[in-house]
Design a protein with these regions (language model features):
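Outer-membrane beta-barrel "beta-signal"
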Residues: 200-223, 396-408
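Residues on the lipid-exposed face of transmembrane beta-strands in outer-membrane beta-barrel proteins
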Residues: 63-69, 112-118, 132-136, 162-170, ...
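Outer-membrane beta-barrel translocator domains and adjoining extracellular loop/strand segments
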Residues: 47-53, 97-103, 141-149, 190-197, ...
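Transmembrane beta-strands of outer-membrane beta-barrel proteins
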Residues: 33-37, 83-87, 126-134, 178-182, ...
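Surface-exposed strand-loop-strand hairpins of Gram-negative outer-membrane beta-barrel proteins
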Residues: 43-62, 98-106, 249-280
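Repeated loop/turn-to-beta-strand initiation elements of outer-membrane beta-barrel proteins
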Residues: 73-75, 124-126, 170-178, 214-218, ...
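Transmembrane beta-strands of outer-membrane beta-barrel pores
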Residues: 39-45, 69, 89-95, 134-142, ...
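Residues that define the transmembrane beta-barrel architecture of outer-membrane proteins
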Residues: 31-33, 55-63, 81, 104-112, ...
Length: 408
């Protein structure tokens, strides 16, 4: 794992570079972005299950390479108020956090991520806006049923990293900015492994940015939305068919296994990774260059019915498990929204199962969600690909990798 980690982190960084940074900057009205470097420190505190700890605070340090977009009226850059795209590294000193139980600990965590920072309002030398980040983290202080039992928040060394927050920027000099920020951050195994309670923390701090070239002129205060000229955007309906898949670590199987074997045996047990699949159809109406809304129909395949039936028998008794229904296919429909920046879209779906039979323990109700990124590369259109988190009532089910085709 130590040898493959740099390759995985590099892949994440390259992925964000391809999807949202200068590689896509050749749309109408865009010009070459400005380049800057940013370094900062934050004081963070654990934000959930706080009674599990005796010490909550830790320091976080970040280093970013920033791309400051520049665009004329009619460009996506101008429509988003000249956002900053970044690739960065963060170190979270989680080893400072102390568990109440002696059988629990964290270690330092390193994250590689891509981010977008967008100003909402500018006034003189000051600006205020929001930030969003997505990437991967690595830490060797994960769950172990014998040596780290109290840390049930993540159980694999490689984790998803998600962050969001706000910033206040002061242009101190022609090429220097001071930035105060607050953020909420999340790490989890994304159901590649279990247990997977998720690690949530929040805080704030200060950073400094140095521009290697003159900063772009905004020429306005606040936000306005000019007409976007991009051949991907045509107001009206589009239709998308897609298929995807991923893997899932079964919570019910882990819980039942932990009740039937001792801790040493559980430590040597590799929880099975169950294949998951999906088929979908979206009808989306493009309201503007930045927004689209629509409806969707989905079918899902879950291969872990055998594990669910066995686990329900252990947890609830054989009689209850025999009376429950188990079917690998489920069907649902819902609403979707896409928020576009050039040929990248943030995709959000809220759905309702009208058919789902998953036994007792895995019956999380009728609602499901999908959230992630869709990429529409010009060279392979009308095909697209995406990565998203499939969830039940906002609890991760699996990471879904999809490919699809788009028609107008």
């Amino acid at each position: 794992m130590k040898k493959t980690l740099p390759i995985l982190l590099l892949a994440v960084v390259c992925g964000f570079s391809i999807s949202g940074l200068p590689a896509t900057a050749q749309e109408a009205g865009d010009v070459r972005p400005g380049i800057a470097v940013r370094a900062g420190a934050d004081r963070m505190t654990i934000g959930s299950f706080r009674d599990s700890y005796t010490s909550l605070g830790f320091n976080s340090y970040t280093l970013e390479w920033d791309f400051i977009t520049r665009g004329e009226a009619g460009s996506y850059s101008a429509a988003y108020n000249l956002p900053v795209f970044s690739i960065g590294l963060a170190y979270n000193g989680l080893d400072e956090v102390k568990f109440r139980s002696q059988n629990g600990h964290y270690s330092g965590m390193v994250a590689a991520y891509g981010s977008i920072s967008r100003d909402l309002v500018r006034f003189g030398r000051f600006s205020f806006g929001y930030d969003m980040s997505l990437g991967l983290s690595y830490s060797d202080g994960y769950y172990h049923p014998v040596t780290n039992r109290a840390n049930w928040f993540f159980s694999s060394p490689l984790l998803m990293y998600v962050a969001g927050g706000g910033h206040l920027t002061w242009q101190v000099a022609s090429r220097i900015d001071l930035i105060a920020d607050i953020s909420v951050r999340h790490n989890s195994s994304a159901r590649f492994a279990y247990p997977n309670g998720g690690l949530n923390y929040w805080g704030g701090g200060l950073s400094a940015r140095y521009h290697f070239s003159d900063r772009p002129e905004s020429g306005r205060n606040g936000v306005r939305t000019p007409r976007i000229s991009d051949d991907l955007y045509e107001k009206g309906w589009s239709y998308e068919f897609y298929a995807g898949g991923g893997v899932h670590a079964c919570a019910a199987e882990w819980l039942a296994t932990s009740r039937t074997v001792d801790k040493e045996t559980l430590a040597a047990t590799n929880l099975r990774k169950w294949p998951m699949g999906s088929l979908g159809f979206d009808a989306i109406y493009r309201l503007s260059g930045r927004f689209g809304v629509g409806v969707s129909a989905s079918a899902f395949y879950c291969s872990n019915m055998e594990a669910l039936r066995w686990a329900d028998g252990i947890i609830y008794g054989e009689e209850a498990a025999s009376a429950a229904s188990y079917a690998p296919f489920s069907f649902g429909a819902g609403a979707v929204q896409e928020v576009f920046y050039k040929r990248t879209a943030f995709y959000l779906q809220e759905g309702y199962y009208f058919y789902r039979k998953s036994g007792i323990h895995a019956d999380h109700g009728h609602l499901y969600e999908r959230a992630g990124l869709r990429l529409y590369p010009r060279r392979i259109e009308p095909f697209f690909f995406s990565v998203c988190i499939k969830a039940h009532r906002f609890k991760a089910d699996y990471m879904d990798f999809t490919v699809g085709i788009r028609f107008k």
